[in-house]
Design a protein with these regions (language model features):
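Detector for Asparagine
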Residues: 4, 16, 38, 97, ...
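Glycine-rich, acidic/polar active-site loops that bind/position phosphate-bearing ligands
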Residues: 146-278
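N-terminal hydrophobic targeting/anchoring segments and the immediately downstream early-domain regions
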Residues: 2-22, 142-150, 156, 162, ...
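An N-terminal domain-start capping segment
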Residues: 2-7, 59-63, 247-256
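Histidine/acidic residue-rich metal-binding segments in metalloenzymes
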Residues: 13-121, 125-143
């Protein structure tokens, strides 16, 4: 199919598309973090001793003892199961600019052949996937490809809702069997730790004594571009590289006035509302 015919077909598909129905958004206070196992939910679900320990781990990076990890895992599982979740996944961010996951189930069989749900602290803290599919700088042979996911308690677990079900997502880091970082989060956590150490040292030199843990924060990019899927599927550069590699040069003058401060098109507004609800 020629490029012109493909474009004409895309335009026809867009023209014939039925409008998307939009549900009235719920109150923000009702839906905010409803699928997140944050500190507020931990405080409600855990004993005072366990909550104090996990809160200290979240704020200072203090190691969590196995007994407390078991308590946190049990509370996390009960909360997730109560929301219809049967599976959990350690999610991490390898150096491929995409996410990676290792899925497991809460369901195990007992001696009577029945099914029960179980989730221990050891399952929460560490997983054992294969690391051979991820970039490694060619520093090891295939037989040394073992990698480990490790729970990052500084990021709250959350439930990913899809049309095919729900999964408890456990934010994790990914390292090699020798301890090297194999993801993008370990360097970030190490950078935050170094920044916190240096900043606290400066504050103490300035006479400050009551210093909390310092963290960095960043905001999402506010400018984005929406491309209709019919057009995107006809562009190999967008599909493979995620960017425009060929095409007409953009307008550099004031030829258009609908990009800044323009009225929001209906389809764009539908997208924005759906995205914000999620």
């Amino acid at each position: 199919m020629s490029a012109n015919a493909s474009r004409q077909q895309a335009i026809q598909s867009i023209t014939n598309r039925e409008p998307t129905a939009v549900e009235k958004p719920e109150l923000l206070g009702k839906i905010w973090a409803e699928d997140v196992f944050n500190l507020a939910r931990m405080e409600w679900a855990l004993s005072k001793t366990a909550f104090k320990a996990i809160k200290k781990t979240v704020h200072t990076g203090e190691p969590l003892d196995p007994a407390t990890a078991d308590v946190v895992a049990a509370a996390m599982k009960e909360w997730a199961v109560s929301r219809g979740v049967k599976f959990f996944s350690h999610i991490f961010y390898p150096m491929t600019n995409i996410t990676a996951e290792k899925h497991d189930g809460f369901i195990i069989t007992n001696s009577d052949g029945g099914a029960i749900t179980d989730f221990s602290g050891s399952l929460l803290i560490k997983g054992e996937p294969d690391g051979s599919s991820f970039p490694n700088g060619s520093l090891r042979m295939t037989n040394a490809a073992r990698g480990y996911t490790a729970w990052d308690p500084t990021s709250p677990a959350y439930i990913m809702q899809t049309d095919n079900g729900a999964t408890l997502m456990i934010p994790s880091v990914f390292r090699s069997w020798t301890g090297e970082a194999r993801d993008k989060k370990i360097p970030l956590l190490r950078s935050n730790a170094a920044m916190n150490k240096a900043a606290q040292r400066v504050l103490r030199l300035m006479g400050e004594t009551d210093i909390a843990t310092l963290n960095s924060s960043c905001g999402a990019e506010q400018e984005y571009f929406l491309v209709d899927s019919n057009f995107a599927n006809a562009r190999p550069d967008l599909l493979l590289a995620g960017r425009t590699l060929f095409g007409a040069p953009p307008a550099k003058g004031q030829e258009f006035d609908d990009h800044y401060f323009g009225a929001i098109p209906t389809r764009v507004q539908v997208f924005m509302q759906d995205y914000e609800d999620q």
